[in-house]
Amino acid sequence: MRTTQYLLSTLKETPADAEVISHQLMLRAGMIRKLASGLYTWLPTGLRVLKKVENIVREEMNNAGAIEISMPVVQPADLWQESGRWEQYGPELLRLVDRSDRPFVLGPTHEEVITDLIRNELSSYKQLPLNLFQIQTKFRDEVRPRFGVMRSREFIMKDAYSFHTSQGSLQETYDAMYRAYSQSFSRMGLDFRAVQADTGSIGGSASHEFQVLAQSGEDDIVFSTGSDYAANIEMAEALPPAGGRADATQERVQFATPEAKTIADLVEQFTLPIEKTVKTLMVKATKESGHTLVALLVRGDHELNEIKAEKIDIVAAPLTFATEEEIRALVNAGPGSLGPVGLNMPIVADRTVAAMSDFSAGANIDGQHFSGINWQRDLPLPRIADIRNVVEGDASPDGKGTLLIKRGIEVGHIFQLGTKYSEAMKASVQGEDGRNQTLTMGCYGIGITRIVAAAIEQNHDERGIIWSPALAPFQVAILPMNMQKSFRVKELAEALYQQLRAKGIDVILDDRKERPGVMFADMELIGVPHTIVIGERNLDNDEIEYKARRGGEKRLIKTDEIVDFLMAELAQ
């Protein structure tokens, strides 16, 4: 590719609305342009990277035995109503009607469509197992699109779906896809971790996320210092504190706290140890519980894990915090003065709270708190559950070492769905015994567009992007200095360009009438791994300058050795 025949839309300045480095660099490198909130046009440089990601994923899917298909983006609403996700999915599901007032959705995922296809195409266990995938545009109506293509409304995703007649068969495919994902991300040069994860609105039993480690990540990833345990913070179990609960040493005392609206206020104003305070959070209860609200107790310095709390049978899903009006109707106090003593509703205490003594909490009277609260003396022990996020230093759930927490960007997610969709949509085949058998399913997603952003978050410097060789839009850049004024510079640049193209190398020849500084800056910005500079002075010594993007190594190479040298570098 020649720059004079290419749309190289680089920017010198960082756009003001770009928050994270990947968004900034994708705009500056001319990879994307914003059309509307959460919607982006992919320019040639960005599309070249995107296609390389797609090709790696496609190759690994083929190697894992998956078969490619293509399904419609627009899906009939009745399939979502049949699966039960029409209401469950929420406002992220973009709903629309056609000219005949028939309801449709823009697909964020394709579980319903693939299940409908399979129930009409398969009839016998002999046709299974089957693993189908597609690489296609998806749409989620994000309430606040942000971070460029990291959290956009329209995005490209690889989604695969497998069908089985046994859990054992599903496990085999799940393991194969786990390996395929690991191989894909390794080939892309990403520093990633596979972690245990929650199944979310997709549903099912087992699930793993593939997280690219980056400070800008939105997810907290938990690791053990003493084993290979890794999990999303939503799933990481917080073990009960070691040792028993200490005996009471204080009497319960009520004291005025008119200015303390939060735990932070309470700790600051009364110099209380935060680990001796308890937060009382009220959420909606299920109808079956016979109650309106449930009180959840966590230690003052801990955070409620909403995913864990939502799984408690008396807590309504999705988890919804009570409004101040709803709280006052039952307690006659505001959220800043709530506590467990005398509370007339179901209470669920975190394991850590259940092990506390002499703690402080609200008195359920505005502007009043208790100190010196003790279980069994001042109130009975409530229901106990793990409902908090782990923190660094907690014991690892597998009993080996302690926990560390890092930030991650989710780029892949695999699920063992079981029979959630096949039962709801009556997808079955004739089993080996002649009876109808409900299909067991797995689903497997990779965020193609998100991978591009995640790779940049991990690989950049002050000059721009540093692509791995597998993802770079171009592998080699040829920069001829003043080629319009030097016949031998132009002749060698053209010859080298043709030689590299003949060897199948993605090469860009910068044949613009630009200053050398501009040419260098652009190639560093878009992240070309290998740059060769052809200038009159070095040609006097029959040499060409080579520069590596990663590490910045510079070397002078003999002109008749440069092709072999580059091929050796590209083979590494």
Swiss-Prot record:
Keywords: Aminoacyl-tRNA synthetase, ATP-binding, Cytoplasm, Ligase, Nucleotide-binding, Protein biosynthesis. It is found in: Cytoplasm. It holds the Pfam family HGTP_anticodon. Its main location: cytoplasm. It comes from the Bacteria. Its EC number is 6.1.1.15. It catalyses: tRNA(Pro) + L-proline + ATP = L-prolyl-tRNA(Pro) + AMP + diphosphate. GO terms for molecular function: aminoacyl-tRNA deacylase activity; ATP binding; proline-tRNA ligase activity. It is an enzyme of class 6 (ligase). GO terms for cellular component: cytosol. The keyword ATP-binding applies. Gene3D superfamilies: Anticodon-binding domain, Bira Bifunctional Protein, Domain 2, YbaK/aminoacyl-tRNA synthetase-associated domain. InterPro entries: aa-tRNA-synt_IIb, aa-tRNA-synth_II, aa-tRNA-synth_II/BPL/LPL, Anticodon-bd, Anticodon-bd_dom_sf, Pro-tRNA-ligase_IIa, Pro-tRNA-synth_IIa_bac-type, Pro-tRNA-Synthase_IIa_type1. SUPFAM superfamilies: Class II aaRS ABD-related, Class II aaRS and biotin synthetases, YbaK/ProRS associated domain. One of its GO terms (biological process) is prolyl-tRNA aminoacylation. PANTHER family: MITOCHONDRIAL RIBOSOME PROTEIN L39/PROLYL-TRNA LIGASE FAMILY MEMBER (PTHR42753), PROLINE--TRNA LIGASE (PTHR42753:SF2). NCBIfam families: PRK09194.1 (NF006625), proS_fam_II (TIGR00409). Homodimer. Consists of three domains: the N-terminal catalytic domain, the editing domain and the C-terminal anticodon-binding domain. Catalyzes the attachment of proline to tRNA(Pro) in a two-step reaction: proline is first activated by ATP to form Pro-AMP and then transferred to the acceptor end of tRNA(Pro). As ProRS can inadvertently accommodate and process non-cognate amino acids such as alanine and cysteine, to avoid such errors it has two additional distinct editing activities against alanine. One activity is designated as 'pretransfer' editing and involves the tRNA(Pro)-independent hydrolysis of activated Ala-AMP. Belongs to the class-II aminoacyl-tRNA synthetase family. ProS type 1 subfamily. This is Proline--tRNA ligase. It comes from Erwinia tasmaniensis (strain DSM 17950 / CFBP 7177 / CIP 109463 / NCPPB 4357 / Et1/99).
